[in-house]
């Protein structure tokens, strides 16, 4: 007949608080143990948005639309192509820069002293 938590105006006892807490903790552990994990399609292609969604709800199925999937694959392909192009250019540049430095050194080795005319004598 009374309220499920006890009498209305009487606070819960320490024992009852501990029992409620224990039940809450056990249920939480049970949920974590028996968690159903949602399916992930295209495992290699996961964006930060999907990781955020996975963190908030582990049960959510994560799928990419065809458009997003194509865009991500294209982005990865272009990044790899750019990276290989940078690697090819990197070794060839030092070879080019070493030759002009040698020419500059040859030019600076032979400085000649030149005497200047006095402008005051001519005027």
UniProtKB/Swiss-Prot annotation:
Residues 1-21, 82-123 are annotated as: Disordered. It comes from Homo sapiens (Human). This is Uncharacterized protein C11orf98. Pfam families: DUF5564. InterPro entries: C11orf98.
